[in-house]
Amino acid sequence: LSADSSILLDVRDLSVRFRTRDGIVRAVSELSFTLRRGETLGVVGESGSGKSVTSLAIMGLLNRATADIEGEILFEGTDLLRLNKNELRQVRGRDVSMIFQDPFACLHPMYRVGKQIAEAVRAHSNVSRSAAWDRAVELLGAVGIPNAKVRARDYPHQYSGGMRQRAMIAMALVHNPDVLIADEPTTALDVTVQAQITELIDRVKREFDIGVILITHDLGVVAETATHVMVMYGGRAMEYGPANEIFNGAQHPYAWGLLESMPTIEKRLDVLVPIEGSPPSLLHPPSGCPFHPRCKYRFEPCDSRVPPLVEIPGGHRDACLLPPERKREVWANRISRELGVAT
């Protein structure tokens, strides 16, 4: 058991490899992070960075016939990777729950929404069907579905995209989990509904006193709700620390690139600055730092050494070989450009 009793989830050196006809896909490599009660960990990165694979590994939803998983995933001291199927089923959905990307694909089109939530209630509770139905209606109301008693009898196609996502959040909360994983919960929703869903997840965290892992490519969502941020690239953590430190003092060139490509009201740039190039192949990853082929600050060691995630002051960690003084210089120049100040 971790010495820090406030830690709900402690992921240590997690690596996930998929065996394919073409070779080994290194989806996640040596990933470590913690989640405490009351925290929201925002996991950001481009598609293929390993964000969703990490969440599926935590939930025990990867097929062990094709996936090799190493490391530890400790939930309140218990390694989830060492549990058998029955033991894991007792944890999944009850202690650790997940909101998936596409609510329409996750809800069965032939069953009423309330019935599907009620089934989730009965999966871990010895309650009657009527009691489970009442709980489903209660949860639908709690997540903002109007006239929940009536709408519980609707089918998924009768719900809007935002309402379907609210129903998925209700389903994830049926057993008051300690950890809630939200995998791209605002994908394909309009901006107004995105804000409502993000606000709902944040309210749920406060009211239920849980830990949330928010997986997204939207830095704006992370800036609004996350207490901590982990930046992933090529299956590895590039930077990890308190959200205010990441947004106000990022140390990794990839994090700089993500921030420069994010539009904000404060920026005085005429155009956003894209990150040149494409994410690496996880089947044939580059040697050394996975970001070095796209990094404009790379120097000699970057193509041969994999930088470790090392701690710097303030509980902040980054995986970059660039000297600290050079990082400070780059960050100062970036701020000056945004403010329109000559350097």
Regions found by a protein language model. Give the residues of each.
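Conserved ABC transporter NBD signature motif
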Residues: 67-79
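Conserved ABC ATPase signature
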Residues: 154-159, 163
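P-loop NTP-binding/switch modules centered on Walker-like glycine-rich loops
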Residues: 46, 60, 181, 185, ...
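Short catalytic/signature loops enriched in Gly
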Residues: 5-7, 146-150, 240-343
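A short, proline-enriched helix->beta-strand linker immediately N-terminal to the Walker B motif
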Residues: 174-178
